[in-house]
Amino acid sequence: MIRRRKKVRKLRGSHTHGWGCKKKHRGGGSKGGRGMAGTGKRNKSKWTWTIKYAPDHLGKRGFSRPPEVQREVRVVNLKFIDEHLDELMQMGIAYEEGGKIIVDVTQFADKVLGTGKLTRPLVIKARAFSPKAEEKIKAAGGEAVLV
């Protein structure tokens, strides 16, 4: 059996170590700059790459409102009011007055939305109503009161 030592190719004495000309194995200069250099407005050396792979790299995108200006609108659906009317009565949010049930939504929400349907006439007090919610409240024989 022939035992031959494995030849290890470490390129000793090679001037360029497989990179061709010496200049080709230099830093970012041979690549058009390091990283995203050349993708900007002025030096468009990598412009075709930018357009294909990073089209959103340039330009303005949106605006963030300051947190102190932002206000979360708490919403409630008609479905919730109709299903939980007994609980709202016990909590004192809804009460009966002159044969009508009045629900004061302002204690836990800002706006009433129109998902679901009302099974009985209610007078609902809120800061805002969606058009669909107002329509459904009136169709059930109730009243939408802006506070």
Swiss-Prot record:
Pfam families registered for this protein in UniProt: Ribosomal_L27A
Keywords recorded for this protein, A-Z: Ribonucleoprotein, Ribosomal protein, RNA-binding, rRNA-binding
Keyword Ribosomal protein tagged: yes
Residue stretches of biased makeup (Basic residues): 1-28
An MF annotation (GO) of this entry: rRNA binding
Gene Ontology biological process terms from the UniProt entry: translation
Region (Disordered): 1-43
Oligomer and partners: Part of the 50S ribosomal subunit.
Role this protein plays: Binds to the 23S rRNA.
UniProt-recorded name of the protein: Large ribosomal subunit protein uL15
Source organism phylogeny: Archaea, Methanobacteriati, Methanobacteriota, Thermococci, Thermococcales
